């Protein structure tokens, strides 16, 4: 057994929980271990009560190659558990406690655990979303409690970093969302299409959970301008918004033959197939913190089209890896037509290949050291 003091104790979703936060936590902590930084992850015995979880399951069947210990210890709704966890942290005595934050449901457990910590343990808030995408009662008050127990903060984008800076005088380090290290290998486009039983049309895809703020209705509307083009739309991900309204919209616009839907949470191999089969990945969000899909699209060297909003547009504009559209269906349809042109595809793919070397977990950890 390793008796060396834990450098980083990380509270976050991790296996067996599914999703991008869990996936990236594994890449992050594996990289910490590879840098000889002793790391342990404490995840949740209960994260979301079933009553408020909108999906089919919170759990993943995927197996991760992890180099660190994961313990399921934190219950988000049990105050007695919070005190117990705080005592366990003090006993372990890590140099840093990293609290990964993406939802107000974490504020109370993080606050009460932090309240009873040994003050020598430095607490870092690692922030995915600062403002919840859907309105939550008392969010500002809850977030202030969380802020009180953190010594400093790290964000995955300037957009989120600026939001945090508006709320606190504590140190905030704005970084970037790295490309995960455990992604399945790139697949040839023809093989990916064959795997998914797709025809030879151009394909553009929306990948991820379908929620109201993701702008999928706008994306569907853009295809009324593309009816006569050899382009099909893939919507792949679990619907957290009622699917019927999207199906009704598709039928009303006469787009049944143009839209392919997979209403399932996608494991990483399926995400790989859809992105590799696509000519473009589209993120038509109405608001965003940053995107976990952008680094995945970069890994698979697929150009992007994103909304003209903070949190999405900056990386695309900086790297010239796709197009930014002005938040109307008509403008999105024009961006799609422009971006599937051969010369544009070659340019964007070339720019992605040059840029993606910047977005590594290794570089993220080097930047993190300054905090």
Where are the language model's segments positioned?
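Glycosyltransferase donor-sugar binding loop
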Residues: 44-48, 207, 232-247, 263-264
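Nucleotide-activated donor-binding/catalytic signature segment of Leloir-type glycosyltransferases, i.e.
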Residues: 246-269
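Donor nucleotide-sugar binding/catalytic pocket of nucleotide-sugar-dependent glycosyltransferases
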Residues: 148-186
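Acidic donor-binding loop of glycosyltransferase active sites
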Residues: 273-289, 302
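Acidic anion/phosphate-binding donor-loop and adjacent secondary structure
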Residues: 37, 136, 165-166, 178-195, ...
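Short hydrophobic beta-strand element within catalytic cores of glycosyltransferases
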Residues: 297, 303-306
């Amino acid at each position: 057994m390793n008796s060396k003091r834990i450098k980083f104790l990380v509270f976050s979703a991790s296996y067996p929980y599914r999703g991008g936060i869990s996936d990236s936590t594994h890449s992050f902590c594996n990289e910490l271990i590879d840098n000889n930084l002793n790391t342990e992850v404490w995840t949740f015995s209960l994260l979301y009560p079933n009553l408020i979880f909108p999906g089919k399951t919170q759990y993943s069947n995927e197996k991760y190659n992890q180099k660190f210990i994961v313990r399921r210890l934190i219950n988000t709704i049990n105050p007695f558990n919070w005190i117990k966890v705080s005592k366990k942290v003090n006993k372990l005595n890590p140099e840093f406690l990293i609290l990964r934050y993406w939802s107000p449901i974490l504020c109370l457990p993080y606050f009460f655990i932090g309240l009873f910590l040994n003050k020598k343990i430095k607490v870092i808030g690692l922030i995915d979303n600062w403002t919840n995408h859907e309105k939550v009662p008392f969010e500002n008050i809850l977030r202030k409690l969380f802020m009180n127990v953190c010594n400093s903060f790290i964000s995955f984008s300037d957009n989120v970093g600026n939001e945090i800076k508006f709320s606190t005088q504590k140190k905030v380090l704005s970084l970037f969302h790295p490309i995960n290290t455990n992604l399945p290998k790139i697949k040839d486009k023809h093989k990916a299409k064959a795997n998914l039983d797709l025809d030879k049309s151009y394909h553009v895809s929306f990948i991820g959970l379908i929620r109201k703020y993701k702008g999928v209705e706008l994306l569907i509307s853009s295809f009324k301008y593309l009816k006569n083009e050899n382009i099909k739309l893939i919507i792949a991900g679990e619907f957290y918004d009622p699917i019927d309204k999207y199906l009704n919209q598709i039928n009303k616009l006469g787009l049944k033959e143009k839209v392919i839907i997979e209403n399932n949470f996608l494991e990483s191999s399926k995400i790989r197939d859809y992105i590799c089969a696509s000519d473009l990945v589209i993120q038509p969000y109405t608001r965003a913190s940053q995107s976990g899909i952008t680094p995945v699209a970069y890994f698979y060297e697929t150009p992007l089209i994103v909304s003209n909003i903070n949190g999405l547009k900056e990386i695309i504009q900086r790297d010239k890896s796709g197009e930014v559209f002005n938040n109307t269906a008509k403008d999105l349809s024009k961006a799609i037509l422009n971006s599937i042109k051969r010369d544009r595809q070659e340019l964007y793919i070339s720019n992605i290949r040059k840029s993606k070397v910047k977005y590594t977990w290794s570089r993220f950890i080097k930047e993190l050291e300054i905090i």
